[in-house]
Amino acid sequence: MNNSWWLEPCKAIDTQMVEQALARQQQLTKPAGSLGRLEPLAVRLAGLQGRLKPGIERLWIAIFAGDHGVVAEGVSAYPQEVTGQMLLNFVSGGAAISVLARQLQAQLEVVDLGTVTPGLNLPGVRHLNLGAGTQNFVQGPAMTRAQGEQALQAGRDSALRAHADGAQLFIGGEMGIGNTTAASAIACALLGIPVAQLAGPGTGLNAEGVNHKAQVIERALALHDASRGDALQTLFNLGGFEVAALVGAYLACAQEGIAVLVDGFICSVAALVAVRLNPACAPWLLFAHQGAEPGHRHVLQTLQAEPLLDLGLRLGEGSGAALAVPLLRLACDLHGQMATFAEAAVADRPA
């Protein structure tokens, strides 16, 4: 791997296995297509996993956390200390994703890339200390190139741990007060969509707060306008450590051959950056849901993504992706365990 490891080739999809899985679907005891989107979902997983009967026995969930300098502009309904406090909640088992991980029997890891809370040393948390959060991107770049590359590598390292653990599906989650502002800014810069269409309430801003948030993003876009066409520099200028880690994780998963289930708005923006950096990663990215943030729909449309769920979620943490895991597991079970017409001695539709 060279220094720009994220540009290295992604693993190829097993097209022969896709054809075999499609053929199996046609022989199952049901009218063709009657299980709707569950059918192509199982076929796609067969191609990603390289086996006729795919499954998700081993699931890896990584939560990446980091604070954001732009919070100084008053863009969040919650104080910055919440990021550090939630790290303890994750490993203590009290967060939504902690509950979901237990129910799904998933491996859950928590990675702290850099918060404003000094001296955090929590058992069960990987503290990387890239900085006390990012810088205020209205005044300059959110992070240095060195910090950005370290954050990308942190995501890659998590994906490599997932691979070593035998994970068949990777979910990345995020925690960082202010990160919907960062994600909205990145999306605006890369998509060229007006800020007013992308800025949303985040953790609960009122209409006045959303309007202020949009103005802050406008100022940041004007400052960093020269880099708009450069996905990597846009990530470093406007992103968060946890967003960069998600980008790195998604790209490394595609290179190692692990299917990714992308969570909500922030994770989808990370997926957008990943696809812009290395388009070959796209087939490895499945999208769990369409969230309540207004910008999410635009990002999903750009990625030509079909989210599995639409439940009005806006929590983050990887929670929406975790909620979609049973759907993937059931799609695999139906594909792998249903009888064929021949096995069940059921007459097929005449050719």
Swiss-Prot record:
InterPro entries, sorted: Nict_dMeBzImd_PRibTrfase, Nict_dMeBzImd_PRibTrfase_bact, Nict_dMeBzImd_PRibTrfase_N, Nict_dMeBzImd_PRibTrfase_sf
Residues annotated as catalytic: E317 (proton acceptor)
Enzyme Commission designation: 2.4.2.21
Pathway listed: Nucleoside biosynthesis; alpha-ribazole biosynthesis; alpha-ribazole from 5,6-dimethylbenzimidazole: step 1/2
GO MF terms, alphabetically ordered: nicotinate-nucleotide-dimethylbenzimidazole phosphoribosyltransferase activity
Transmembrane segment boundaries: none
GO biological process: one example: cobalamin biosynthetic process
Reactions catalysed: 5,6-dimethylbenzimidazole + nicotinate beta-D-ribonucleotide = alpha-ribazole 5'-phosphate + nicotinate + H(+)
Matches recorded under Pfam families: DBI_PRT
Keyword line: Cobalamin biosynthesis, Glycosyltransferase, Transferase
Matches recorded under HAMAP family: CobT
Role noted for this protein: Catalyzes the synthesis of alpha-ribazole-5'-phosphate from nicotinate mononucleotide (NAMN) and 5,6-dimethylbenzimidazole (DMB).
Assigned protein family: Belongs to the CobT family.
The protein's name in its UniProt record: Nicotinate-nucleotide--dimethylbenzimidazole phosphoribosyltransferase
Organism: Pseudomonas fluorescens (strain ATCC BAA-477 / NRRL B-23932 / Pf-5)
